[in-house]
UniProtKB/Swiss-Prot annotation:
The keyword Membrane applies. The modification Phosphoserine is found at S208, S261, S396. Belongs to the FNDC3 family. InterPro entries: E3_ligase_FN3/SPRY (IPR050617), FN3_dom (IPR003961), FN3_sf (IPR036116), Ig-like_fold (IPR013783). This is Fibronectin type III domain-containing protein 3B. It comes from Mus musculus. One of its GO terms (biological process) is positive regulation of fat cell differentiation. It comes from the Eukaryota. It is a single-pass membrane protein. The chain crosses the membrane at residues 1185-1205. The lineage of its organism: Eukaryota, Metazoa, Chordata, Craniata, Vertebrata. Pfam families: fn3. May be positive regulator of adipogenesis. Residues 184-213, 230-265 are annotated as: Disordered.
Length: 1207
């Protein structure tokens, strides 16, 4: 089969005609988007292509045909190929992509590789889904026939299938099945997980049937015949039509209750059970056309399909075929899944017993398997044997042997051995035919190679030929060859040639080994070439180096002796370029001297000759001329043109060749000095501090350009200095004195040097502004003013008209405070102890002079400023000020400006008193009256004097904290103490105004707080009996925490013994009984005794009959038919105080003396009476029931009240 799929980005203009016009695909082509692509599917003759039309129906196209289809997303649809085929995506030069499905080449796999097991070629991700293609979801896959044991099962490939109607796609081979997971176990149990998922899905479903049971599947299945068939019926869709189980489903309500959901689940389970029963009625398959490696299976639908439209299914969607080669009860593997009623099994093993059974599957419901049927494949020709092996050889004979291949059910009768008679590529001829597994060939040529191949034959036929193998006969060791001959020698290579040794036939294979000795110090030869050629080029050699070569010949029998040694030398290489020429000595107007060094790489030979070339460097003269040729490395040039640029380069010549030229060196000869310039002249008017000069270019006989000019100035003191040096014809000379005569002259400079100075020009500067004033003098007056005075500066050529004085706190804030002709000025209203600066500038008609130096000064200090912020700290930690806030106040203020003198102290005025404190911003006023208001103010003091007072503030002290109350013990118990303190009816403080802190002393003599609150009583629990405890108490109010009280010590009492259970009474012989009761251990060292009392008949008081430490007592002299009641209590006798503490009496135990004749009935009656008494509640139980009832009623009333209040 050969299917080609072509994809183009545009709609073809001429489409091939469709077969019978059955495929209505033109709407897709006409209405498609520009981004869509046209897919041309070529169907070959004898093939069938199935597609889904636009209306959902299936249409089959018989080949040959070319079907145009539209890809909406531009991707290639999936192509599922049959076994033994592969798909490839090919894009040609025109941009057309083709998916080619071709038979799988056997050369792509090693022997026995299961090439037919990959039904779907792994396509790219963009070939996954396409709406117009129907996926071949269920296909039969068969492994090839291989020799058992040639390849382990884990080497079978795991093919990847497209999504099917099952949860997990699988492909199962025929043998080597241990590496695959069976799918029969997936259907052996009911699908519990799917039932649970479907129960959840039914809650949200309205009218749709179950999605997995009633879903229609129209997958095209390949069944081994190479054609597609439409499987399934259109009536089995999910809408409930046809004969499928969907007919049973009725319309459901839009809203369902939990009861309807349970009924749906039960109905669904019954439906699944009915479908399984129908599918389980399938009969065993029929076997036909049994061959050696293939067989045809066919089967009929399940029997229940013909039971009417409501009793059966219209058509099962698919079938599964399971195969076993381990016997009837062996392990079965699924080898086919599809909708066809026939299956063609291929790639079976010849002469092998197989068992096969079939399942019917409807969506996810699978029926029971049919009865297995067995068959045996036919025998066939043997497998291809392995190549024969060489057992023995001589100069004229070869002995071969081989192993028998797999006979495939028919015994091997003979073997066919063929050879080429030693003639390469001349065909094979038979040299042995027989049943033996060895063969000896004689009368062969020595040292000759022969090619053999083997085939096996049985009664069925002849196998294929084995791989070819070449065997050689023995021969003689070659004679010593002649020494190799030199063909040609290069810089890094040498080509050698040699001839075959004497006595060797032309057919004999001779291998030559060329050895080389690279280092003269190393006497060993190393192999450089091994082969059958008669020539060799040895590369990667050193230049101008001597090497030694020798040759050795060898064949299958051994090596010859080495030949004579050939000595040859590689050629030298051409030298490298010399170094760049360098100037040696000074350069003159007509010549200079140059030198150069030999090249770093001489190429392996001496350099006998150097060439020095020169050019004048002009664009017109671009040709180099040889100025020197010889062995020297320096040369002197003469008779050159002045002021001309020349370029020099050097090269060398040796036996290796001509080197490259070195880098060029540019050299310019010196020019002649320029002539005398004309005197400089003033450009414009002279200024008071500078003049602008200009001059002309001097005349020059050499024609060289002037590079620079030098201007010299002579001052009135006859001091000469250079004021300009540069290429311009004008300059500005500054920093001159006003009204002063200066003399100037100029000279020119070029490559030849300086020319003579010009004649002198005398120039007078204009009058200038005043000079810089000296720093002004600053003095302070007694009234706090500042007097500034200064002296007049020099003013060349004009009188000073005014002075300007600038004043400020720093240089950036200077402001003009005075301008006029006076030489002093007084500053007022300045800040005390402040930094100020000033500067002075003088003016005349010519302009303003420079500023004087900046003068800094500081005004004298004064008394401090008033305190701006004064406050009372209300909350201050007690650790900082331990005094009570009732008798002290904590003042805090901000430090005022000290006006240049550090603050020494502060005066605090309280109205009737005044105190002085040091330089601080916090002070505690002590020894004040509680609950008193004070008016406070403060002033600062420094060395200059006292500053003004601040504003008054009012502050009030707090009341005194409360005193601790008296602590008393209201009640004491064995494990608790109830303490009380103070008077709860006191009206000294308002309710909730006082808080008490009660502390208990622990074993480490430390007091720990056990209560804090407004209450006047507290009960301390979990104490130890008869133990002393120490307490103290503290009261706290808004005024603060009061002091702790003195320590009070209270002791707990001793505990009484516990209440005992009712005693047990046992009747003894005669008129006596014995009473038993439980014991109590000694209590903290105090012994425990017991008191037994009895109530006789109708007496109203108990009488004591025993007191002691024993837990039993006997009473005699009792009267029959008389009621006795016994009770017991424990008594604790305190050793330290001799006090006796008695516990509560136990419940009474009744006893009546019985006669022996009625003991049995009496016992029974006693048991019933005891039961009745046990059912009656005791006093404690009755009290607990009453408390529980009241608590329940309280909680109920609380809930009712809360409900009505919230409403």
């Amino acid at each position: 089969m050969y299917v080609t799929m072509m994809m183009t980005d545009q709609i073809p203009l001429e489409l091939p005609p469709l077969l019978n016009g059955e495929v209505a695909m033109m709407p897709h082509l006409v209405n498609g988007e520009a981004a869509q692509q046209v897919i041309l599917v070529q169907v070959n003759p004898g093939e069938t292509f199935t597609i889904r039309a636009e209306d959902g129906t299936l249409q089959c196209i018989q080949g040959p045909a070319e079907v145009p289809m539209m890809s909406p997303n531009g991707s290639i649809p999936p192509i599922h190929v049959p076994p033994g085929y592969i798909s490839q995506v090919i894009e040609d030069s025109t941009g057309v992509r083709r998916v080619v499905v071709t038979p799988q080449s056997p050369e792509c796999y090693p022997p026995s590789y299961p090439s037919a097991m990959s039904p779907t070629h792994h396509l790219p991700p963009y070939l996954t889904h396409h709406p117009h293609f129907i996926q071949n979801s269920h296909t039969a896959y068969y492994p090839p026939v291989t020799v058992p044991g040639d390849m382990p099962p884990q080497f079978f490939p795991q093919p990847h299938l497209p999504p099917t109607i099952y949860s997990e796609p699988e492909i199962i081979p025929l043998y080597g099945m241990s590496s695959y997971v069976t799918r029969e176990d997936q259907y052996s149990k009911p699908p519990h997980k799917k039932l649970k998922d479907r129960q959840i899905d039914r809650q949200n479903r309205l009218n749709s049937p179950p999605s997995t049971i009633y879903k229609n599947s129209c997958a095209t299945v390949y069944n081994g015949y190479g054609k597609g068939h439409s499987g399934g019926s259109s009536g089995g869709g999910g809408g409930g039509s046809g004969g499928g189980p969907g007919i049973k489903k009725t319309e459901r309500r839009a809203r369902s209750s939990p009861k309807s959901s349970d009924s749906d689940l039960q109905e669904y389970e019954l439906e699944v059970k009915r479908v399984q029963d129908i599918l389980s009625g399938i009969e065993k398959p029929q076997v036909s056309n049994i061959q050696a490696r293939a067989v045809v299976l066919s089967w009929a639908p399940p029997v229940g399909l013909s039971c009417g439209p409501h009793g059966g299914l219209s058509f099962p969607y698919s079938y599964e075929v399971a195969l076993s080669d381990k016997g009837r009860d062996g392990k079965y593997k699924i080898i086919y899944s599809g909708e066809e009623l026939e299956c063609n099994l291929k790639d079976l093993r010849p002469a092998t017993d197989y068992h096969v059974r079939v399942y019917a599957v409807y969506n996810s419901v699978k029926g029971s398997c049919s009865e297995p049927v067995s068959f045996t494949t036919h025998s066939c020709a043997p497998e291809c044997p392995f190549p024969p092996k060489l057992a023995h050889r001589s100069k004229s004979s070869l002995t071969l042997q081989w192993k028998a291949p797999i006979d495939n059910g028919s015994k091997i009768t003979s073997y066919l051995l063929e050879w080429d008679e030693g003639k390469r590529n001349s065909g094979f001829r038979q040299c042995f035919f027989g049943s033996q597994k060895h063969c000896k060939l004689t009368k062969l040529c020595p040292a000759m190679g022969y090619t053999f191949r083997l085939a096996a034959r049985n009664d069925i036929g002849t196998s294929g030929y084995s791989q070819e193998v070449v065997c050689y006969t023995l021969g003689n060791i070659p004679q010593m060859p002649l020494a190799p001959r030199l063909v040609r020698a290069g810089v890094t290579w040498i080509t050698l040639q040699w001839s075959r040794p004497e006595g060797c036939s032309p057919e004999e294979v001779i291998t030559y080994t060329l050895d080389i000795q690279e280092d003269e110090n190393d006497s060993h030869f190393h192999p450089k070439y091994t082969g059958e050629d008669l020539t060799c080029t040895v590369k990667n050699l050193k230049r101008s180096t001597q090497y030694k070569f020798r040759l050795t010949a060898s064949n299958m029998e051994g090596k010859s002796c080495p030949s004579e040694v050939l000595v040859c030398t590689t050629s030298p290489d051409r030298p490298g370029p010399p170094t760049r020429p360098l100037i040696k000595g000074p350069v003159t107007s007509h010549g200079f001297s140059v030198k150069w060094d030999a090249p770093k790489d001489n190429g392996g030979s001496e350099i006998p000759k150097y060439l020095l070339e020169i050019t004048d460097g002009t664009p017109e003269a671009g040709q180099w001329e040889v100025a020197y040729s010889g062995s020297a490395t320096e040369y002197v040039f003469t008779h050159l043109k002045p002021g001309t640029l020349y370029k020099l380069r050097a090269c060398c010549i040796s036996t290796g060749g001509h080197s490259q030229c070195s880098e060029s060196l540019p050299v310019r000869t010196l020019s002649l000095a320029p002539g005398q310039c004309r005197p400089p002249r003033v450009l414009g008017r002279p200024k008071h501090k500078g003049v602008h000069l200009e001059w002309d270019v001097p005349a020059s006989e050499s024609g060289c350009e002037v590079s620079e000019y030098s201007v010299e100035m002579t001052e009135p003191e006859n001091v000469a200095s250079e004021v300009y040096h540069g290429p311009e014809l004008e300059c500005t000379v500054g920093n001159l004195l006003p009204g002063t005569v200066y003399r100037f002259r100029v000279r020119a400079l070029n490559d030849g040097g300086y020319g003579p100075y010009s004649d002198v020009s005398e120039i007078t500067t204009a009058a200038g502004p005043p000079g810089q004033c000296r720093a002004p003098r600053v003095s302070f007056t007694p009234d706090g003013c500042v007097l500034v005075g200064w002296e007049s500066p020099a003013s060349p050529g004009a009188d000073i008209s005014e002075y300007r004085l600038e004043w400020g706190e720093d240089e950036q804030s200077l402001e003009l405070v005075y301008h006029g002709p006076d030489t002093c000025f007084e500053m007022r209203d300045l800040l005390p102890a402040a930094q100020y600066c000033c500067r002075l500038q003088a003016f005349n008609p010519a302009g303003a002079g420079p500023y004087s130096e900046l003068v800094h000064c500081q005004t004298p200090a004064s008394a401090p400023d008033p305190v701006s912020t004064l406050c009372v700290l209300e909350e201050e930690p007690p650790s900082a000020h331990p005094d009570s806030p009732s008798v002290c106040l904590v003042l805090n203020w901000e430090e005022p400006c000290n006006n240049g003198s550090e603050i020494l102290a502060y005066n605090i005025d309280l109205g009737d008193s005044c105190i002085t404190v040091g330089n601080t911003t916090t002070h505690v006023m002590k020894n004040l009256l509680p609950e008193t208001t004070y008016r406070i103010r403060i002033q600062a003091i420094n060395e200059i004097g006292v500053g003004p007072f601040s504003q008054f503030i009012k502050a009030k002290t707090r009341p005194l904290p409360p005193s601790p109350p008296r602590l008393e013990c209201a009640a004491s118990g064995p494990q608790s103490l109830k303490l009380k303190w103070g008077d709860s009816n006191s009206k000294t403080h308002a309710a909730g105004d006082m808080v008490y802190t009660l502390q208990l002393e622990d074993r480490n003599k430390r007091f720990i707080s056990i209560y804090r609150g407004p209450s006047h009583t507290y009960k301390v629990q979990r104490l130890t009996e008869f133990t002393c405890y120490s307490f103290r108490i503290q009261a706290m109010s808004e005024a603060g925490e009061g002091p702790y009280s003195e320590t009070y010590t209270f002791s707990t009492t001793k505990s009484v013994p516990p209440t005992l259970k009712a005693p047990r009474v046992t009747q003894l012989e005669g008129n006596s009984c014995e009473i038993f009761w439980e014991t109590v251990p000694p209590m903290r060292g105090d012994p425990v005794s017991y008191v037994l009392q009895v109530l006789v008949g109708r007496d109203s008081e108990y009488k004591q009959v025993y007191k002691g430490e024993e837990a039993t007592f006997q009473i005699s002299g009792l009267q029959s038919n008389t009621d006795y009641r016994f009770r017991v209590c424990a008594c604790r006798r305190c050793v330290d105080t001799s006090q006796e503490l008695s516990g509560a009496f136990s419940p009474s135990a009744a006893f009546m003396l019985q006669q022996r004749e009625v003991m049995l009935t009496g016992d029974l009656g006693g048991m019933e009476e005891a039961k009745m008494k046990g059912m009656m509640p005791t006093d404690e139980q009755f009290a607990a029931l009453i408390v529980l009832g009241f608590a329940t009623l309280s909680i109920l009333f609380a809930f009712i009240l809360q409900y009505f209040l919230m409403k």
